[in-house]
């Protein structure tokens, strides 16, 4: 069963993502509410997949990607972003994030992105 770390400052998003991912056969091994926690959890757990919100307090998802990828170049990180953050998303992809979804998104859209990232 593939493992996932869910990173989002909104508890309702972590719960919603967790429910979807469990339904698709993932094991939720950890959650984080900011980029700093995400780095710590990634180092500890080294999950198969990370869903990472872009805009969070303490440390952004982009800054977390910039710290995780040099240490773990094969990390599979999917960014979750609001509309209008495309320049930052390009920066995240250039720094090693594998793909992104834009809020609001459908479960089908998220599943398609996850399936593509997990195939690589």
Label the predicted regions.
Residues 11-30:
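Two-component/phosphorelay signaling modules centered on CheY-like receiver
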Residues 34-37, 60-63:
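Acidic catalytic/metal-coordinating carboxylates
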Residues 45-51:
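Active-site beta3 strand of CheY-like receiver
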Residues 56:
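Receiver (REC) domain active-site loop signature in two-component systems and cognate sites
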Residues 83-84:
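Short, conserved "switch-loop" micro-motifs in signal-transduction and mechanochemical regulators
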Residues 87, 105-114:
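C-terminal output helix
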């Amino acid at each position: 069963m593939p493992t996932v770390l869910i990173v989002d400052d909104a508890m309702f998003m972590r719960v919603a993502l967790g429910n979807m991912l469990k339904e698709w056969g993932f094991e939720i091994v950890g959650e984080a509410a900011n980029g700093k926690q995400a780095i710590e959890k990634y180092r500890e757990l080294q999950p198969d997949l990370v869903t990472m919100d872009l805009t969070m307090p303490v440390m952004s998802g982009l800054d977390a990607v910039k710290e995780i990828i040099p240490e773990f170049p094969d990390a599979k990180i999917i960014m979750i972003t609001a509309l209008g953050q495309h320049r930052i998303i390009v920066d995240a992809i250039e720094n090693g994030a594998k793909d992104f979804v834009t809020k609001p998104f459908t479960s089908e859209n998220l599943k398609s992105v996850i399936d593509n990232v997990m195939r690589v």
